[in-house]
């Protein structure tokens, strides 16, 4: 009888130990998760509001070196041109419209006393002539920086099964094929310049990403997929070029006033290109809102906090986020179709 009682006590004790171990494991995991969250929030705030602006002398500014910028004639690309020139870089500007490039060339070279080369090509045409022209022009100059800004989205949100084939091909060609081909041409030139530099000059490759690539976006499926591809490609390239002293970063942005976004009015969540580019160049090398991602930066403060909230609260691949994104872009599509119908009646 006593032996049976003692056996039962031993069983209960063992079960109690197992329960205690389980509870302590859950508690430990909770503490680890909370600590990680707190550290990420702190790191984000330090990146955004505490650390001083990045010094671009390490990338060879004010030393005769060039920065190549694609999609440079309008919006964010145009602002990158102004602000990189202000930091002392000579420029090679690549875009589609020669008249815009020549106007920009004259304005920047006069204002900042830097050399500006321009090349007018349409990267939507995936031709060998385009890439040969880029290689021929850029091969003449010492290059330490490349900004892959050129990009294309849908004209309006559209279901994937209704997406025009030409629009789909154009998005993939501009956002992906052209970006990869141009980077493959320019990156060896950057490595060559940094190796030949008498100073410890680093190289820099920036690529424009998007919240559309961060979060799967119904009704912008092709664009969303093209930007998600850039995330994985850019982070992979960062690992490859690290040994060559080239910093590679993907820049994540939410909405910015531009011709592509079709938004003209700024707000707390929607900066203009000048403000967005200033926050980007101030924080290169820091993750800001992209704390969970390697070689990635979400530089504008409201975008950074928005990303941090989504990632830590529900996750970018959650059904809730996908549904909210769908409803949001469906409403944009409905308004766009109504506007198109009204415009058609006026004609």
Swiss-Prot record:
Domain of life: Eukaryota
Binding-site residues for NADP(+), renumbered to this chain: 68, 122, 149, 223, 227, 256, 258
Listed pathway(s): Lipid metabolism; fatty acid biosynthesis
Transmembrane segments annotated in the record for this chain: 22-42
Official protein name in the record: Very-long-chain 3-oxoacyl-CoA reductase
InterPro entries: 3_ketoreductase_fungal, NAD(P)-bd_dom_sf, Sc_DH/Rdtase_CS, SDR_fam
Record Pfam families: adh_short (PF00106)
Family in the record: Belongs to the short-chain dehydrogenases/reductases (SDR) family.
Keyword field: Endoplasmic reticulum, Fatty acid biosynthesis, Fatty acid metabolism, Lipid biosynthesis, Lipid metabolism, Membrane, NADP, Oxidoreductase, Transmembrane, Transmembrane helix
Organism: Vanderwaltozyma polyspora (strain ATCC 22028 / DSM 70294 / BCRC 21397 / CBS 2163 / NBRC 10782 / NRRL Y-8283 / UCD 57-17) (Kluyveromyces polysporus)
Annotated membrane topology: Single-pass membrane protein
Molecular function in Gene Ontology: ketoreductase activity; very-long-chain 3-oxoacyl-CoA reductase activity
Function recorded in the entry: Component of the microsomal membrane bound fatty acid elongation system, which produces the 26-carbon very long-chain fatty acids (VLCFA) from palmitate. Catalyzes the reduction of the 3-ketoacyl-CoA intermediate that is formed in each cycle of fatty acid elongation. VLCFAs serve as precursors for ceramide and sphingolipids.
Its EC number(s): 1.1.1.330
Catalytic activity: a very-long-chain (3R)-3-hydroxyacyl-CoA + NADP(+) = a very-long-chain 3-oxoacyl-CoA + NADPH + H(+)
Gene3D superfamilies in the cross-refs: NAD(P)-binding Rossmann-like Domain
């Amino acid at each position: 009888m006593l032996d049976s009682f003692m056996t039962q006590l031993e069983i209960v004790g063992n079960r109690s130990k197992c329960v205690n171990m389980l509870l302590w494991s859950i508690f430990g995991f909770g503490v680890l998760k909370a600590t990680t969250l707190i550290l990420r929030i702190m790191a984000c705030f330090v990146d955004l509001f505490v650390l001083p602006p990045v010094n671009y002398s390490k990338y060879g500014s004010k030393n005769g070196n060039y920065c190549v910028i694609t999609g440079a004639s309008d919006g964010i690309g145009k602002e990158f041109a102004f602000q990189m020139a202000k930091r002392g870089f000579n420029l090679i500007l690549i875009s589609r419209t020669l008249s815009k490039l020549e106007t920009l060339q004259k304005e920047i070279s006069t204002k900042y006393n830097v050399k500006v080369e321009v090349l007018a090509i349409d990267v939507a045409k995936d031709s060998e002539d385009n890439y040969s022209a880029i290689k021929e022009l850029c091969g003449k100059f010492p290059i330490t920086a490349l900004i892959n800004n050129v990009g294309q989205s849908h004209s309006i949100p559209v279901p994937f099964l209704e997406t025009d084939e030409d629009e789909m091909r154009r998005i993939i060609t501009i956002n992906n094929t052209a970006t990869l081909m141009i980077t493959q041409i320019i990156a060896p030139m950057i490595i060559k310049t940094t190796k030949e530099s008498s100073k410890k000059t680093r190289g820099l490759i920036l690529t424009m990403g998007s919240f559309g690539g961060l979060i799967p976006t119904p009704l912008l499926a092709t664009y969303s997929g093209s930007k998600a591809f850039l995330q994985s490609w850019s982070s992979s390239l960062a690992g490859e070029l690290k040994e060559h002293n080239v910093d590679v970063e993907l820049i994540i942005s939410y909405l910015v006033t531009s011709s592509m976004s079709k938004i003209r009015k700024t707000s707390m969540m929607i900066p203009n290109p000048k403000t967005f580019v200033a926050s980007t160049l101030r924080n290169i090398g820091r993750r800001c809102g992209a704390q969970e991602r390697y070689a990635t930066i979400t530089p504008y403060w409201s975008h950074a906090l928005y990303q941090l909230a989504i990632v830590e609260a529900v996750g970018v691949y959650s059904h809730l986020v996908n549904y909210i994104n769908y409803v949001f872009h469906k409403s944009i599509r409905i308004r766009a179709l109504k506007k198109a119908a009204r415009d058609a009646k006026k004609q």
